[in-house]
């Protein structure tokens, strides 16, 4: 059973981060070292994303398919990062729509199972998991490609990392779907770059109570707050998302990408370099490995299994 950190109810290129040539990231904080060296081969793992080109081939549809809630696992994060790199390497592709095949769900957040520390106390898997999330965000937030999030329902916590990293967000209206970050309700703190994306979208006055209280908004309220750019019926979600992407593609790519860089490089730079990523990892590990958070996560997972 997959579980996610979610609601309890149900030719100028963008500067890209450089992957560490050694495949390692070591972080030191309070004398601790977290290794993010991967120890497993995920090459044979099932695909969690499907990619389909538009009729004219200049943009793609990326569809997340990881029922029941499209939880952002390390496998999902890695696959999305790799897929974006592959699309960027294709000179015919100018943008993509990121959507979901799971009814009523865009993404309900982080993979809770991967936030737990094993009985042996090894924090390596947790550190590797967060590193994969960092790199996924950088890939999506800094891509030269035009991006639109097509949101058919719940977009919560880690789901907002994906949606807010896109240039435009279109969300299904009138349904049960909710949009927001609720990490604080689990005793966690959203990463600074997620909080800043909320502020960039909604403004400080509106975003502050949403993030601090972990509030989740229906589509109409998310639209009013500026967190999403448009609402649409489910039957028109794909069409409206494609239309918004085509609006971006009407601008010459080099100009659009350069302006995107101007707007986003300051926030991207907070993780663009090794020091920033390791500092962010330290912050996450300090919180996620605390006894209170681990107890609360285990209690929540146990309650889900009883349902």
Where are the regions a protein language model picked out?
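Glycine- (often His-adjacent) and acidic-residue-rich active-site loop
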Residues: 92, 100-138
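C-terminal long alpha-helix characteristic of the crotonase
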Residues: 170-177, 228-275, 303-305
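Conserved CoA-thioester-binding segment of acyl-CoA-metabolizing enzymes
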Residues: 2-99, 138
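Intrinsically disordered, low-complexity segments enriched in small/flexible residues
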Residues: 2-8, 14, 22-25, 36-37, ...
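CoA-thioester-processing core
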Residues: 136, 150, 156-211, 240-244
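Acidic, divalent-metal-coordinating active-site segment for phosphoryl/phosphodiester hydrolysis
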Residues: 157, 214-221
């Amino acid at each position: 059973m997959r579980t996610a950190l979610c609601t309890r109810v149900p030719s100028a290129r963008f500067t890209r981060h450089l992957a560490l040539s050694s495949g390692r990231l070591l972080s030191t904080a309070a004398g601790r070292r977290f290794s993010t060296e991967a120890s497993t081969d995920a090459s044979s793992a099932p695909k969690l994303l499907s990619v389909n080109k538009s009729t004219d081939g200049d943009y793609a549809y990326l569809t997340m398919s990881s029922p029941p809630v499209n939880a952002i696992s390390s496998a999902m994060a890695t696959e999305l990062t790799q897929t974006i790199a592959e699309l960027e390497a294709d000179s015919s592709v100018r943008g993509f729509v990121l959507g979901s095949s799971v009814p009523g769900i865009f993404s309900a957040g982080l993979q809770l199972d991967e936030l737990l520390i094993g009985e042996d106390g090894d924090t390596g898997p947790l550190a590797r998991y967060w590193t994969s999330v960092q790199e996924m965000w950088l890939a999506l937030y800094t891509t030269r490609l035009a991006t639109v999030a097509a949101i058919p329902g719940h977009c919560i916590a880690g789901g907002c990392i994906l949606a807010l990293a896109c240039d435009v967000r279109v969300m299904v209206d009138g349904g049960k779907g909710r949009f927001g970050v609720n990490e604080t309700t689990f005793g966690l703190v959203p990463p600074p770059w997620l909080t800043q994306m909320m502020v960039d979208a909604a403004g400080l006055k509106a975003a502050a109570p949403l993030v601090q209280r972990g509030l989740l908004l229906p589509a109409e309220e998310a639209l009013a707050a500026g967190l999403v750019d448009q609402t649409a019926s489910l039957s028109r979600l794909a069409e409206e998302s494609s239309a918004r992407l085509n609006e971006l593609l009407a601008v010459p790519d080099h100009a659009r990408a350069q302006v995107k860089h101007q707007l986003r490089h300051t926030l991207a730079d907070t993780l663009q370099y090794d020091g920033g990523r390791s500092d962010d990892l330290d912050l996450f590990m300090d919180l996620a490995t605390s006894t209170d958070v681990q107890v609360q996560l285990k209690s929540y997972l146990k309650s889900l299994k009883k349902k």
